[in-house]
Structure formats: C-alpha cells, structure tokens
Regions:
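Short beta-to-alpha transition helix within the HATPase_c
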Residues: 1-21, 47-48
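Acidic ATP/Mg2+-coordinating residue in the GHKL
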Residues: 79
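Short alpha-helical Gxxx[C/S/T] motif in the catalytic ATP-binding
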Residues: 108, 112
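Conserved catalytic submotifs in the C-terminal HATPase_c
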Residues: 22-38
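Short conserved segment of the HATPase_c
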Residues: 84-96, 152-153
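Short beta-strand/loop element within the Bergerat-fold HATPase_c
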Residues: 61-71
Length: 154
C-alpha cells in the first residue's frame, strides 16, 4: 500500500485501538519529517502482533511511540504488565516461545522478528525499570521508502 509513514501509523493506531478492548492507549507519532512509503500486510501484522502481546499482558495501558532517527523508523511498544521472564528474553524471536501455555502460542514475536530481519531491521525486548515490558522495532527507511534513489557517479 502506497502511503506515508505518518498516515500508515495513524490509521493503524486508530484501527487497532477501535478493535481491541483496551482501557488506555497512548499513541505518540513523533515523526517530524514524513515520507512516502510502501507498507504491506506483513508490516501491519508485525506491529499489531507486538501491540496485541502488550495488550494481553497489560489490558489497562499500552503505549506506541514512533520516531524517525536518521535513516530508520523506530517503533517502541511499552506496557505495564509483568514484563518478560529472563528465560523468555533469552529466547525472543524463536518459534513456540510463549508464556501463555497454549497450543499454537509463541509464533507472534517469531513472525515479528522474521519480518524485521527480512527488511534489514531489528527487534529488541527488555523489561522496563518501572515495571512492564518494552519492545523496540527498528526498520531501515530504505526498505520501505518509495523515494527514488539517485545514482552516485564515480
């Protein structure tokens, strides 16, 4: 889908919030320089998976913050849930790693990590000092940009 970073994220945040039973969703789009991009359903699903995991751990409050730093889009999802167990943090991105104990669990973050890697991005997870979890997605703008590259002459 051809759009801009801000339009895509604003629409995604609005749709996600409207279709989930969340008490408080703090969304902050701090992208100062918007740009045309192409987002596909895998990118949307990737972001929604992280938000859904946060919601399951923290139904009262989830936060999504978007920033553009140099040549990367950074999305940070935080919650006030119990955080990650140390064993889970060591296994982030591996299939079937879940704290939910249900068949089929544990593919959400595996999917997230694989989509990010295919785009040359990264996913990091940690526990917040004040409690809860933080997951950061960093995607290179070159992987999603619609802007033409200008050839460099030698």
């Amino acid at each position: 889908v051809k759009t801009t970073i801000s339009t895509f994220l604003n629409d995604l945040a609005k749709e996600w919030c409207a279709t989930r039973p969340i008490v408080s969703f703090a969304y902050e789009n701090r992208i100062e320089q918007d740009m045309p991009v192409a987002f596909d359903s895998a990118l949307k699903q990737m972001i929604c998976n992280v938000l859904d995991n946060a919601l399951e751990a923290s139904p009262q409050w989830v936060s999504l913050e978007a920033t553009r730093e140099a040549d990367a889009l950074t999305l940070v999802v935080t919650d006030t849930g119990p955080g990650f167990a140390p064993a889970m943090l060591a296994q982030i991105g591996k299939p079937y790693q879940s704290s939910k104990g249900r068949p089929g669990s544990g593919l959400g973050l595996f999917f997230v990590v694989n989509v990010a890697r295919k785009l040359g991005g990264t996913v990091t997870a940690r526990n917040r000092e004040q409690g809860g979890a933080l997951v950061q997605l960093t995607l290179p703008l070159a992987a999603i940009s619609l802007e033409e590259e200008t050839p460099h002459g030698d």
